[in-house]
């Protein structure tokens, strides 16, 4: 959910919240690793106005909640997300009114530039070169149990630039075991680089996580692979793959940075979904359990 922020009539940004909800519609309650495409995963909404000028769009509201199994829970969650956005908007407006828009926005840009400078300084300490991890593997795509999925990872360092290249990884699959490039893969790459070079606990200075860090890390994943699938491939079960990428980045840089890298994890996440229908309420109950 995103709420626009205006100060003195000028649009200066958004307050936004991303969160998990119990059910998003689709062909199966809660979790569906075996979904054939995005349409089997959920109802798709592209930038629609739930509220406009403070007034609820009742038709859209009805469509959203008529297409999920847990209406009561989802309605509460979405209203909480909206309230968080409104609070963020109000506080940002108050900040701008206190210090002026110019001061607040210039400070925000400087904050991002600071993070970029700090990360570039750490990247520059790594000897130039291409660091390649051994091939990583994922068990299967949740349907074709005898087909393992290849994960290739190379990290190139050149001056204060860094590129993570997944060329050679497994082709996209006909289940939910693909990874959205922008929404999941990039985040994993940013996390891997930050946790090695600017660890929040061990690094001596506080460096905020923001776009200044994100804009430095280049990521290559050829279209049509599990890390950059074509529309409308399903992407619900994307977790183990992104963890494997993080492990591979750490492994690739371990020789150059032995004191800043750790042993990897199992690149596994156990995600169980339980559900049933309550006749007395006329709604599903859904319980999700996540263990890493």
Question: What are these model-derived regions, one by one?
Answer:
Residues 1-292:
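Glycine/proline-enriched, intrinsically flexible loops and inter-domain linkers
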């Amino acid at each position: 959910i995103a709420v626009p922020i205006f100060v003195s009539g000028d649009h200066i940004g958004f307050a936004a919240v991303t969160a998990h909800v119990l059910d998003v519609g689709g062909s199966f309650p809660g979790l569906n690793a075996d979904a054939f495409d995005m349409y089997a995963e959920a109802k798709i909404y592209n930038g629609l106005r739930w509220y406009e000028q403070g007034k609820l769009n009742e038709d859209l509201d009805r469509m959203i909640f008529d297409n999920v199994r847990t209406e009561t829970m989802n309605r509460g969650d979405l209203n909480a997300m909206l309230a968080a956005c409104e609070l963020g908007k109000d506080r940002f407006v108050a900040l701008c009114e206190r210090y002026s828009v110019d001061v607040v926005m210039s400070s925000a840009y400087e904050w991002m530039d600071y993070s970029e400078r700090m990360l570039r300084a750490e990247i520059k300490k790594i000897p130039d070169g291409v660091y390649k991890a051994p091939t990583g593997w994922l068990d299967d795509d949740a349907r074709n149990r005898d087909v393992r999925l290849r994960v290739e990872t190379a990290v190139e360092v050149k001056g204060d630039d860094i590129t993570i290249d997944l060329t050679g990884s497994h082709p996209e699959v006909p289940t939910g075991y693909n990874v959205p490039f922008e929404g999941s893969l990039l985040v994993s790459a940013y996390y891997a680089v930050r946790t090695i070079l600017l660890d929040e606990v061990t690094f001596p200075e506080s460096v905020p996580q923001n776009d200044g860090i994100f804009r430095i890390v280049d990521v290559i994943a050829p279209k049509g692979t599990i890390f950059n699938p074509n529309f409308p491939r399903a992407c619900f079960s994307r977790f183990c793959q992104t963890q494997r990428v993080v492990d591979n980045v750490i492994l690739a840089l371990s020789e150059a940075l032995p004191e800043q890298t750790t042993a990897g994890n199992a690149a596994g996440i156990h995600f169980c979904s339980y559900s049933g229908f309550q006749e007395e309420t006329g709604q599903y109950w859904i319980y999700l359990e996540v263990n890493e």
